């Protein structure tokens, strides 16, 4: 029987829907006025604060829900390596979607700020790498993952990853976050520490910020060979997808080998009892209504994005 003081699936789903609406309304507004301060408000007030308030009101244990357990230095370093090696994998899946979309029209570059100088670089590392890494992990690998674990660990990891991808509300950046969510979710379970997800998330976003900064530097040195002003066409995207896919295959093997070290170091974690999972199967579909509504919103946003590309 579910403990009323413990976070549950329905509560997490409702909070997910509310946060998604806040992201698309208040988040969009504050980021439109000023990207950097808007991102800070979005991450700390719209994404981090709601789950903290929910757990507090629910009366659950913060350390239990968010897995605020120590992470070995060795595992932290391995996670950094795993994330860097997994970056091409996430990029590959995003490129696959971008390639298909490019057949509809000219795709637009993602609305992510890039650093043009070293001071902007450090500011974006704090905002995009550190802040997003902390706040989003508390929400997804913290609250969402813990709430869904009554359905079994595999289901919890998969569902939280899907919701993580959905939460970006960008068809071009959907599969990448899903893949990363699977990796971060598994690492959090193996280590029983949210810090595993935070380190991984911060590393991934840090790589993205660094690559954007380097591209701007290259453009400045080689103004006649601009490599970022225009988005590539379908043929170029196909070539890029094949190339990145080849790189991802190699780095993926490396990431797996590093992951094996963590698996050997951590105790084998048990899955939920079969009878408990069976009870969840009888759960009312009403519990997942907030997710369905969020999915409808996502589809509408994607429709607007595709319509903009085709026109």
Q: Predicted regions: what is each one?
A:
Residues 237-253, 286-310:
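Alpha-helical transmembrane segments of multi-pass integral membrane proteins
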Residues 33-35, 115-117, 224-243:
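Membrane-interface segments at the starts/ends of alpha-helical transmembrane spans
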Residues 20-55, 245-247, 310-311:
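Alpha-helical transmembrane segments in multi-pass membrane proteins
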Residues 2, 41-84, 99-105, 252-275:
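Membrane-helix interface linkers and caps
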């Amino acid at each position: 029987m579910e403990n009323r003081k413990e976070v549950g699936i329905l509560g997490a789903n409702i909070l997910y829907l509310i946060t998604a609406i806040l992201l698309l309304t208040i988040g969009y507004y504050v980021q439109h006025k000023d990207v950097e301060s808007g991102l800070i408000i979005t991450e700390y007030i719209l994404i981090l604060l709601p789950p903290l308030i929910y757990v507090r009101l629910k009366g659950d244990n913060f350390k239990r829900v968010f897995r605020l357990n120590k992470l070995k230095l060795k595992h932290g370093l391995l996670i950094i390596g795993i994330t860097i090696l997994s970056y091409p994998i996430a990029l590959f899946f995003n490129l696959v979607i971008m390639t298909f979309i490019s057949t509809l029209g000219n795709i637009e570059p993602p609305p992510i700020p890039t650093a043009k100088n070293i001071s902007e670089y450090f500011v974006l590392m704090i905002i995009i790498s550190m802040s997003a890494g902390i706040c989003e992990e508390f929400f997804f690998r913290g609250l969402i993952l813990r709430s869904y674990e009554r359905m079994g660990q595999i289901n919890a990891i998969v569902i939280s990853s899907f919701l993580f991808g959905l939460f970006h509300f960008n068809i071009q950046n959907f599969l990448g976050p899903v893949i990363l969510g699977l990796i971060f979710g598994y690492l959090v379970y193996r280590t029983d520490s949210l810090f595993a997800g935070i380190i991984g998330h911060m590393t991934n976003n840090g790589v993205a910020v660094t690559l954007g900064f380097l591209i701007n530097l290259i453009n400045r040195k080689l103004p006649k060979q601009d490599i970022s002003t225009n988005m590539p066409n379908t043929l170029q995207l196909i070539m890029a997808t094949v190339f990145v896919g080849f790189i991802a295959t190699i780095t993926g093997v490396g990431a797996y080998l590093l992951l094996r070290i963590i698996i050997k170091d951590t105790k084998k974690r048990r899955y939920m009892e079969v009878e408990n999972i069976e009870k969840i199967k009888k759960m009312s579909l009403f519990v997942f209504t907030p997710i369905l509504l969020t999915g409808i919103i996502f589809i509408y946003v994607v429709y607007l994005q595709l319509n903009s590309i085709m026109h």
